[in-house]
Amino acid sequence: RTCIPIPLVMC
């Protein structure tokens, strides 16, 4: 899965 840096890091 990919980690997307938004307000919080979702992996």
Curated annotation (Swiss-Prot):
Coiled-coil segments: none
A GO term from the CC aspect: extracellular region
Disulfide bridge map: 3-11
Expression by tissue: Expressed by the skin glands.
Keywords: Amphibian defense peptide, Disulfide bond, Secreted
UniProt record, GO biological process: defense response
Chief place where the protein resides: secreted
Localization in the cell: Secreted
Function: Stimulates insulin release from beta cells at a concentration of 100 nM and release of glucagon-like peptide 1 (GLP-1) from enteroendocrine cells at a concentration of 100 nM in vitro. Reduces secretion of interferon gamma from peritoneal cells in a mouse model. Has no inhibitory activity against Gram-positive bacterium B.megaterium Bm11 or Gram-negative bacterium E.coli ATCC 25922 at concentrations of up to 100uM. Has no hemolytic activity against mouse erythrocytes.
Protein name: Tigerinin-2O
